[in-house]
């Protein structure tokens, strides 16, 4: 990893893989805190590299210090979970055999979840953080660097998106404020485009950094310049990201002119945009304005595209899937399409089991105008597929929902599932549990 002033992260960064790596390489680019001291204390090999506003140069220097057959190149604010770490060596053993047969470098693409200040995933991307250690596989690009083979994007990748996830904490507002990372990136990219105004990839990355820094107007200008000069020289992922972020800007700018929004979307179709976020933002815009059927169509298309998408790049939609299912539930319910509403409501509750509003509407849909123990039993049978009825928390939650709905029969059925100790606890704390 390359680091600068990462004393808050370096210990965790060097801990996750301690038991599976043969060496840990830390390249410091000018820390003034305890980063180097902590890294050396933890047994890492520490090297120093003079910062020259070029992430690829620093990363390639780090690669040159590595002696293993495979490299895990994570930033100091990234880590694999303990569970996923255990999967890495068996996977690499399998891939090493394949690599020797093919005699070409291999990279492993895993999911990357960007976490907010509360630890929730805000977006999900696919990134290459594991790759074979061979001479011609190196990073390219002064910022937002990409693995290349002899100047050409690495073509061979093993898809491990469903197997491995890197968690990234570096995009939180707290980190931005503490590190001034965005200002640094914006400064580097502005210098790049000043030096070469026709470097539209750099303009696209500048738009990303400006947008992350909440400079939406400036970001929009940068993206529009890229669209004006759009061609096949840009990687597919970059083209996708430009269009998706332009649509995102229109959405958050609360643009009311549908033509203005759809002009961008149609342009994205013209350039064969594959990313599901394009349809996602159009779908959100439509649903916000009560255009339910069209909103549903775009959201469903976004979900279909998400299943097929195998490119790099962040996806806001992937970090907001529960929101997608929740919005589809409400739209289908409003249109009286109960079957589709139940399907999406169920998917939402699998992700957000304690989402009261959706659960209450689901129960109302099932109940209709029916009364009595029979309908309550049928609903409880359905709920047992979503909730653990041996778990006190789930039972007490369902009792609270039943009380809010004044569904006495369902409340009684769930109450009777409580153990004696749970009933005693409920009877003592009823007002607090029910939120009354």
Predicted features and spans:
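Catalytic-site signature of metal-activated, phosphate-bearing donor transferases
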Residues: 57-63, 81-218
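Short beta-strand/loop segment that forms part of the nucleotide-sugar
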Residues: 22-31, 47-48, 75-76
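A conserved acidic beta->alpha catalytic loop
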Residues: 16, 28-38, 51
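Conserved donor nucleotide-binding strand/loop of the catalytic core
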Residues: 37-57, 61, 65
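Short, well-formed alpha-helical segments that are part of the catalytic scaffolds
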Residues: 1-23
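Alpha-helical repeat scaffolds
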Residues: 220-228, 256-269, 294-304, 338-349, ...
